[in-house]
Amino acid sequence: MDSNTVSSFQVDCFLWHVRKQIVDQELGDAPFLDRLRRDQKSLRGRGSTLGLDIEAATHVGKQIVEKILKEESDEALTMTMASTPASRYITDMTTEELSRDWFMLMPKQKVEGPLCIRIDQAIMDKNIMLKANFSVIFDRLETLISLRAFTEEGAIVGEISPLPSFPGHTIEDVKNAIGVLIGGLEWNDNTVRVSKTLQRFAWGSSNENGGPPLTPKQKRKMARTARSKVRRDKMAD
């Protein structure tokens, strides 16, 4: 096992512990709490994959951080902070929409890279809006927190979320997953639109009809999904 992988996990565990103390003292805002919950799931998955105990890793991570801080000058810390771009947190969804439990009548789940896509196949002939909470850096989507599909009535009918055991994803991973989600919903004659905020930071533009400009790869993937569905329907007949 690579030593850098282990030490990175140990430091992440300790930093999560510090952030948890901030939340316990009611000093964190909603985006801070969202990231804390997401990272908790990620750390559990990484710990299971690496075969490492989180509590023990936290103690070692504390020692690593304390050693670095002891050697770090205030001037070097200031220069590092000034040269590091800050990410922003974008919220399409309210806290209630983000945390609400939802249920599927005809559930379908698909893993697309490091992202999990869930769709309720029972939903038909609805107008659906995709909304997401995510972080942005350099005016581009950095990390997806959660994406959900809402009907006009406010019901949740689809979702894209990072896999806890597979941390890290790219903007292309997110766009590919959105293409799969849209394809799955549109096959049941639903009309799907993407929020202007998500269009702007994921694709760098927005369409009047709310549809994201899919890449040729995404279009081919949707076409393969369509052909597969047609074959299944024929076999069922």
UniProtKB/Swiss-Prot annotation:
Region (CPSF4-binding): 180-215
Region of interest: PABPN1-binding: 223-230
InterPro entries according to UniProt: NS1, NS1A, NS1A_effect_dom-like_sf, uS15_NS1_RNA-bd_sf
Chain intervals with Basic residues compositional bias: 217-237
Compartments reported by the entry: Host nucleus; Host cytoplasm
Region (RNA-binding and homodimerization): 1-73
One GO cellular component, as annotated: host cell nucleus
UniProt cross-references to Pfam families, sorted A to Z: Flu_NS1
Motif Nuclear localization signal per record, residues: 34-38
GO terms for MF: protein serine/threonine kinase inhibitor activity; RNA binding
Intervals of motif Nuclear export signal: 137-146
Keywords, in A-Z order: Eukaryotic host gene expression shutoff by virus, Host cytoplasm, Host gene expression shutoff by virus, Host mRNA suppression by virus, Host nucleus, Host-virus interaction, Inhibition of host innate immune response by virus, Inhibition of host interferon signaling pathway by virus, Inhibition of host PKR by virus, Inhibition of host pre-mRNA processing by virus, Inhibition of host RIG-I by virus, Inhibition of host RLR pathway by virus, Interferon antiviral system evasion, RNA-binding, Ubl conjugation, Viral immunoevasion
Entry's Gene Ontology BP terms: symbiont-mediated suppression of host cytoplasmic pattern recognition receptor signaling pathway via inhibition of RIG-I activity; symbiont-mediated suppression of host gene expression; symbiont-mediated suppression of host mRNA processing; symbiont-mediated suppression of host PKR/eIFalpha signaling; symbiont-mediated suppression of host type I interferon-mediated signaling pathway
Region (Disordered): 205-237
Alphabetical list of Gene3D superfamilies matching this protein: Influenza virus non-structural protein, effector domain, S15/NS1, RNA-binding
Post-translational modification: Upon interferon induction, ISGylated via host HERC5; this results in the impairment of NS1 interaction with RNA targets due to its inability to form homodimers and to interact with host EIF2AK2/PKR.
SUPFAM superfamilies, per the entry: Ns1 effector domain-like (SSF143021), S15/NS1 RNA-binding domain (SSF47060)
Main location: host cell
Stated role: Inhibits post-transcriptional processing of cellular pre-mRNA, by binding and inhibiting two cellular proteins that are required for the 3'-end processing of cellular pre-mRNAs: the 30 kDa cleavage and polyadenylation specificity factor/CPSF4 and the poly(A)-binding protein 2/PABPN1. In turn, unprocessed 3' end pre-mRNAs accumulate in the host nucleus and are no longer exported to the cytoplasm. Cellular protein synthesis is thereby shut off very early after virus infection.
Assembly: Homodimer. Interacts with host TRIM25 (via coiled coil); this interaction specifically inhibits TRIM25 multimerization and TRIM25-mediated RIGI CARD ubiquitination. Interacts with human EIF2AK2/PKR, CPSF4, IVNS1ABP and PABPN1.
Domains (record comment): The dsRNA-binding region is required for suppression of RNA silencing.
Family stated for the protein in its record: Belongs to the influenza A viruses NS1 family.
Protein name as annotated: Non-structural protein 1
Source species taxonomy: Viruses, Riboviria, Orthornavirae, Negarnaviricota, Polyploviricotina
